[in-house]
Amino acid sequence: MFDIGLNITSSQFDHDRDEMIARARAAGVSNMLFTGTSLEESEKACAFARRYEGCWSTAGVHPHDASTWNDESAARLRALAGEAQVVAIGECGLDFNRNFSTPAEQEHAFTEQLRLAAELALPVFLHCRDAHARFLALLDPWLDKLPGAVLHCFTGTEQEARETMARGLYLGITGWVCDERRGLELRALLPVIPADRLLLETDAPYLLPRDLAPRPKSRRNEPCWLPHILKQVAQWRGEDPAWLEATTDANAARLFLKNASPA
């Protein structure tokens, strides 16, 4: 299995990171993509990708951190993207829900990262929350210059899913879909997503699936729970889990690993 979204640099993993990776492997999660959310975190994610076999990383600035973008940011990301472990630009995009950075700052950092990804011919790992129309408006001019993109941790509506997929993007599905309180709309639209546009991720340590039984003592999510997400998604889509695993693994490899060096 391939977890395309793991926040490896989170301090929640500081005391047992090696053991967490070992639990993932024991559960059948052999490949992982570590998310970079700032320049510093992207550098750390790349270092962890060097350390763990079968793992890669992204390099980017999350919309929450867009206020930190300056003239040096693109140069530092460009240098980092030259590392063999870095296979995508991101996490980048727009988040108008909390606006930790202003919308103008977010839009500038997003556009500059799209420009960089186009220059380097790298796919993009995207974030969008409460900003769908503006997100697409900024993304559209770059689509024919990018080798691919995934909208990570998709939690939008069916209409938003259709508009996103019409542009050729992949959708990343997390344990959000296992939440009986807020994930039912996403669960209902799962069959709308073509299998060749679907990717799976935990977004660990966040979004622990709420329907795990028995429920873990800790609320911290881990990549070892990706098989549970896969099983549930396959059930709600009416597909064989083994087939869906092979399909989503192939999707991840096609998007991220076309030109990657073996990890």
UniProtKB/Swiss-Prot annotation:
Domain of life: Bacteria
InterPro entries: DNase_TatD-rel_CS, Exonuc_TatD, Metal_Hydrolase, TatD-like, TatD-type_Hydrolase
Residues the record lists as binding a divalent metal cation: E91, H127, H152
GO molecular function, one term: 3'-5'-RNA exonuclease activity
Keywords assigned: Cytoplasm, Exonuclease, Hydrolase, Magnesium, Metal-binding, Nuclease
GO cellular component: cytoplasm
Cofactor: Mg(2+)
EC id: 3.1.11.-, 3.1.13.-
Location of this chain's protein in the cell: Cytoplasm
Function: 3'-5' exonuclease that prefers single-stranded DNA and RNA. May play a role in the H(2)O(2)-induced DNA damage repair.
Assembly and oligomerization: Monomer.
Family (UniProt): Belongs to the metallo-dependent hydrolases superfamily. TatD-type hydrolase family. TatD subfamily.
Protein name: 3'-5' ssDNA/RNA exonuclease TatD
Lineage: Bacteria, Pseudomonadati, Pseudomonadota, Gammaproteobacteria, Enterobacterales
Gene: tatD
